[in-house]
Design a protein with these regions (language model features):
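Conserved alpha/beta enzyme-core scaffold
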Residues: 1-290
């Protein structure tokens, strides 16, 4: 095992313009796995023409859309904490400047599963309808066993995946801790997204000794061989929360939502919270974190 610790700027250099970017999430909760530290750095570096794959496209995807980083989004849900469609995503889609691929929760999960298992697709029964041709990569086929028509759900294979965890060692072995107990994304979708991706950027609240990882293997959800970069990023999920570390910052979420309603105000938001802080430590100091 090699030491994979690096800076957020070096880690994000793994992402190229035009790549497919997988973001492990779900929505705002104390169990969020969203690497907002990496999302902000992607916007800061001005990455362009990205396809973002995110189970629930929310603030993190909206920030990248508003920063001009995206050409397309793929999701099973797209909403802003019960307040409708995220403002930048809505505005850009209405203007024809952002495309979308929509899944059901089940088809998205199967796509991530196929990618994590190294398969090209997974068959799905019961989804064959007149909407299938509208998805650019789905196909129907006849079962070789009984001739039944099935849907081939294409594997989701990000070029780069982002994930934030409570703790990890320097090699990339990562633990979700209490997150595993109540979060389907931590238990299944996030690890599969990591396995599916060609490269993985992992940010973490703290870096712990490998001996501690070995002592609590039941809490380890990601293994070193799937991770390419490890970045220490306290408050790295903010304004989302992390179980046992901090709660979601709902005031900041509302501040973001108000700023994103207007392009000029959103540019000011980016200047303050994305372009000005040089890395996770500076961002944590800006928001008053430890």
């Amino acid at each position: 095992m090699r030491d994979k610790r690096t800076t957020i700027a070096n880690a994000v250099s793994l992402l190229n313009d035009g790549d497919t970017l997988g973001i492990a999430s779900p929505a705002v909760s104390p169990t969020a796995l969203v690497s907002m530290a990496a999302v902000r750095e992607i916007a800061r570096q001005g990455k362009r023409d990205l396809l973002v794959v995110n189970a629930m496209a929310e603030l993190e995807t909206d920030l990248l859309a508003g920063a001009g980083c995206l050409r397309e989004v793929e999701f099973w849900a797209c909403q802003f904490f019960g307040q409708g469609t995220p403002p930048n995503i809505r505005r850009l889609m209405e203007a024809g400047q952002l495309r979308a691929r929509e899944h059901s929760e089940f088809s998205f999960t199967l796509g991530v599963m196929a990618g994590g298992m190294g398969l090209k697709f997974i068959p799905l029964h019961g989804f064959v309808n007149d909407l299938v041709p509208q998805h650019p990569e789905w196909r129907t086929f006849d079962s070789p066993f009984d001739g039944q028509q099935l849907l081939a759900v294409t594997a989701i294979v990000p070029d780069v995946a982002l994930i934030h965890v409570p703790r990890a060692d320097q090699f990339g072995n990562a633990q979700f801790g209490d997150t595993n107990r109540d979060n389907v994304a931590a238990k299944f979708i996030a690890p599969q997204m990591v396995r599916a991706a060609k490269r993985v950027i992992l940010t973490t609240e703290e870096i712990i000794p490998n001996e501690q990882i070995r002592a609590t293997p039941d809490q380890t959800g990601i293994l070193y061989h799937d991770v390419d970069a490890v970045v220490l990023a306290p408050r790295g999920a903010h304004p989302h929360g992390v179980t046992g570390y901090y709660e979601p910052d709902r005031d900041h979420i509302q501040q973001y939502h108000q700023a994103a309603q207007d392009p000029d105000k959103f540019r000011a938001y980016l200047d303050t919270y994305v372009h000005a802080p040089e890395g996770p430590a500076a961002y944590a100091a800006l928001i008053g974190g430890e």
